[in-house]
């Protein structure tokens, strides 16, 4: 892949975005690359990007990035959040987290660093990442302002956004949808505002008595994004922090504004996706996906989980993957992973691995439910390998081959058992596969009976 050459050829364009080029009728090399990865026609990809239903987050300065897409008419994607805090982690650790996330299948990563050396950490992550890197620039601005609302100026925020764009960040969470008039709507909530960026901007508005500066200066942000092809990830500052607060007036009021901002970004030919909850009980997940598609004009929906219960700290990657699978089936384009450390602390490298795998499971389950072409081929190959006792093939096909092999080795470590027609669960006498194969040898195909014409959905 020679992305440097692709970008160089397009230097004459003032607006560098994939959306702008798509609307000019141009099928870019990034679109062709994405089409091959997704099994789609390049012209279809161009149409989806032009329409805004698909984004290709690919900053022109992240030249070793392998283009990917996020959209309702593509495979469900997974994002992994990494980044330091003021109390823990360092650059080598965050780089290792990035590598592990990518190894286990993260489609994008976000650097959410809030501690020391934010710029240097981000640079190191971008340098090792072959997937798009996202950020939340208000964090760095808040760090520079030392948590002082008076020092958090519009110029500072815009300078941080421009510097991050210049560095190669492909998408940024911009909390432009939370407005001053929304603040009274959170008073009844159990957990108020749980978005860090949202809380910072709420404090800014409350103390200045002014409107959200990201909303007021949205056009200026669009001008920056056009130069570097940065995509908006329109932040849900008022996402619910517990299922009790789900789908309330505050969340929905902000969602309507996000829909307006999508159209505003599109007027600049800037790509945009919309962030979503959060904490949502299972029976409300589908509604949340459908209303976003309606109000946000089918811009890709990027959801955090959602968690469908609040009582499983230490296992929130499981509780949220349940919601994520349903969300992906109902229309979410990308799932932001949650790790076992959610609500408890900063994830370590192993937590990142566990979170990514949980969400790759959720995304794949959603692709199967959506009847995505070829999605079930992987599962069919695994099933055939299982029934044929091809243990090494099973390990090879597993989402986490090392763990699958290690679990088998716990009781049957010798290499000879990798061709055995049983495992330690049933042993050679109780293996249903083995018994079933013997039955099949004795039953003639002519003995099959007609069983109706019903077809599974």
Swiss-Prot record:
Please name the Pfam families in this protein's record: ThiC_Rad_SAM
Cite the annotated pathway.
Cofactor biosynthesis; thiamine diphosphate biosynthesis
Under which name does UniProt file this protein? Phosphomethylpyrimidine synthase
Note on how the cofactor is bound: Binds 1 [4Fe-4S] cluster per subunit. The cluster is coordinated with 3 cysteines and an exchangeable S-adenosyl-L-methionine.
**Upper classification of the organism:** Bacteria, Pseudomonadati, Aquificota, Aquificia, Aquificales
Family classification: Belongs to the ThiC family.
Q: Which domain of life is it from?
A: Bacteria
Q: What is its EC number?
A: 4.1.99.17
GO cellular component terms? cytosol
Which Gene Ontology terms describe the biological processes this protein takes part in? thiamine biosynthetic process; thiamine diphosphate biosynthetic process
Instruction: Provide the binding site for [4Fe-4S] cluster.
Output: 423, 426, 431
